[in-house]
Amino acid sequence: MQLSEGLAAHGTRRAGKWKRTQVPLLGEECADMDLARKEFLLGNGLAAGKMNISIDLDTNYAELVLNVGRVTLGENNRRKMKDSQLRKQQNENVSRAVCALLNSGGGFIKAEVENEDYSYKKDGIGLDLENSFSNMLPFVPNFLDFMQNGNYFHIFVKSWSLETSGPQIATLSSSLYKRDVTSAKVMNASAALEFLKDMEKTGGRAYLRPESPAKRACVDVQEESNMEALAADFFNRTELNYKEKLTFTESTHVEIKNFATEKLLQRITEILPQYVSAFANTDGGYLFVGLNEDKEIIGFKAEKSYLTKLEEVTKNSIGKLPVHHFCVEKGTINYLCKSLGVYDKGRLCGYVYALRVERFCCAVFAKKPDSWHVKDNRVKQLTEKEWIQFMVDSESVCEELPSPASTSSPVSQSCPLCEYINFKIQPLRYHLPGLSEKITFAPKTLCRNLFSQHEGLKQLICEEMGSVSKGSLIFSRSWSLDLGLQENHKVLCDALLISQDKPPVLYTFHMVQDEEFKGYSTQTAQTLKQKLAKIGGYTKKVCVMTKIFYLSPEGKTSCQYDLNSQVIYPESYYWTTAQTMKDLEKALSNILPKENQIFLFVCLFRFCLFVCLFVFFLR
């Protein structure tokens, strides 16, 4: 079965049955895993053992679930961890899992608590994890909810919100650097978005900066350009004197370092990506290695072969940096690397590593952006091209979950809603006798046909709606097909309930007694939730419950599965008000076929009319 992009789990149909399959991916070996709990391993090409993120299919939730393995939790416990690398790796795993879910329609993270006697209410999570969440999210409670369930810790993640004009994708690090006075700093998501949009608007920029107008001579005036000019003169010298004092200091265009010779190659390899990115994305600049904190020329001792190797390391490091072009020319990073000889009383005693980087026409990354999503049943890191496309083009975000071809709007956006309702919508309204008129059923023709053809269905619906004070029940021959998935022909029909004070419920009705429909129902509900956020534009927390009923030929009914009795969500996922009902119906109108879209326009119109009448009578 072919699935829409971005879904974590998929169902296969075998002899009419749906089963949630588990296929091992790249990463750690799956051979030793319990066959009942095989999971999708992270397929990002990183070394096995370092990454421990997997897609967990052994779950009752209609959610994308990422398992991050064993994690030490609690501020004191995490602070006392002896293995700092393990603490860092756990933080990265959890943070990347959060990022992937934010960018993939939401879900939750499952972590097995490493430390005994852990209590969320007493111990908290851990300051390093909290800081990672805060750095990624504008307001953590709007996106994350935390829950301990025995020895497991769950982090419920709402889909990244598209309600603002800010970044359209969650990011741990842009990997785009800039010079900030005397430092190379990574751009946060907002700064990166502004930088990229400026580049896109102008189609890149010239390699050479515009020449400054001539200035009158002012002896006492010192500017950034003075330090840059002195650094340029220093770079162009052929000989340097040992212990000579510099006449300039670090600035926007100058960075000074001093490393021990035995670690020189390693340290230069480590720092080059961020400093080259920063200089290239700003206005160019100079990196000098071999000067001490007192701005004295010290140099480092090296053979000629070592200097050659140093140039090769520089060339290879800069050549591997990811770049993205908005311009037509698509040039390369311009730089010049050399080793300046240091002399002590005429005797060569060492070298200073000198690197000049010209400003770049477009964007230079230090490495791939640290941003993740779930695609093709794998947790993947975005390439710089994908990330930029999502950042600057909000339409690209929706492409992760392709909308069915039938989801085009049935009416022009310029057509007044009331005019459209008067001519098209009134016949679709439908109410069942004995139930509150605040409960609406649709589409009218399909409802009547189903109730007349299948004895017991109407009575079952009346019983299920008995506790609903206000809501809409939207029937479909196949909600799975409406959402772009494969239809199960053994399903009689599906119905989605959107009601006040309860989460949405997806009902599945069938007449095949010995069949298993849990996988079908779960997959449909999960896809619906993801599309509500990524295509429909729904910005609040939401979960979709599932309920499966068997209808016998004699009209008898029985509930085969009720997700609400199997799972627990944070309280915030159960808050459904009149406003959230309206927002859900509006989001559904963006992803449904035309017939159901029309019904949702009815719901929106009735809600607006009700509010207007209420305000009128209050006056």
From Swiss-Prot:
What keywords sit in the KW lines? Answer: Membrane, Transmembrane, Transmembrane helix
Where is this gene product found? Answer: Membrane
Question: Where is it mainly found?
Answer: membrane
Gene3D superfamilies in the record: Schlafen, AAA domain (3.30.950.30)
Name this polypeptide is given: Schlafen family member 12-like
Q: Return the GO cellular component terms, semicolon-separated.
A: membrane
The transmembrane residues are: 598-618
Q: How does it sit in the membrane?
A: Single-pass membrane protein
This protein's record includes keyword Transmembrane: yes
What InterPro entries does the annotation carry? Poxin-SLFN/SLFN_N, Schlafen, Schlafen_AlbA_2_dom, Schlafen_AlbA_2_dom_sf, SLFN_GTPase-like
UniProt lists the family membership as follows:
Belongs to the Schlafen family.
Domain of life where this protein originates: Eukaryota
Question: A Pfam family in this protein?
Answer: SLFN_GTPase-like
